[in-house]
Each structure stands twice: as C-alpha cells, then as structure tokens.
Regions:
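Conserved catalytic motifs of ABC-family nucleotide-binding domains
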Residues: 18
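A short, surface-exposed alpha-helical micro-motif characterized by mixed small hydrophobic
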Residues: 64-66
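ABC ATPase "signature
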Residues: 82-84
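Catalytic Walker B motif of ABC-type/P-loop ATPase nucleotide-binding domains
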Residues: 22-26
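Helical segment within the ABC ATPase nucleotide-binding domain
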Residues: 36-49
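ABC ATPase nucleotide-binding domains
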Residues: 97-117
Length: 117
C-alpha cells in the first residue's frame, strides 16, 4: 500500500468508530490533490450531516480556509488566535505567526493565500 492508501484506510477506520468528535492530524498530507479534495469534502459533509465535531491539524492554510468554520493558531505552543476563519485568516495574523508576508486574493468566491517574496 502507498502512503496515501494507508492514510485513507486510517481515516475510514476512524470514521467507523462513530465518535462525536474526530481529531485528525494532517489527514491529507500523503494524498494526491484529487483525494485531498475528496477527503476534505467528505469530512465537511459528515460533520454537517451527523452533528460531528471534526478537528483537523493542517499546515496548508488554503485547505484550512476552504474547509474550516473556525481556525486556531498556535505560536510557541500557546493559542495565539481562535475564531471564525474569515476573521482569523488575515495578513497581519499570518505575518505575526509565520513571519511571512501574504496577499489574500478572492477567486470564484473563495479566498486564497498567496505568499509574497
């Protein structure tokens, strides 16, 4: 099995437990783009349909923007910001936490983070 196949099996196993809270650490890190999108859509739909709390640890901020209702930023192991995705994902918050200048652009009604050099 490839790393991506193993990761999909682990996610499926977690979903069969029928827990009310699901915590996934980098659930899409070993998946190709198609399966990243599918997995995040499935998780979001399951959360809505089953009143499930899904906590995902993601380093890809564009996926976080697209699929999260709320965002929590950690800095030096402590909570730096928590709240609605649209309020937390700002150029100043990204600069403070990651020391990176970004632009947030909108395309087809979705926000995307573009790092600036």
């Amino acid at each position: 099995m490839s790393g991506g196949e193993k990761q999909r099996v682990l996610i499926a196993r977690a979903l069969t437990q029928e827990a009310k809270i699901l915590i996934l650490d980098e659930p899409i890190s070993n998946l190709d783009l198609k399966f990243q999108l599918e997995t995040m859509k499935i998780l979001k739909n399951l959360a809505k349909e089953n009143n499930l709390i899904v906590i995902t640890i993601l380093h890809d901020l564009n996926f976080a923007i697209s699929y999260s209702d709320k965002i929590l930023f950690l800095k030096n192991g402590k909570i730096n910001n928590f709240g609605d995705t649209k309020k937390i994902i700002t150029t100043s918050n990204i600069k403070e936490i990651f020391s990176v200048d970004i632009d947030i652009v909108q395309f087809k009604n979705k926000n995307y983070i573009i790092p600036l050099e």
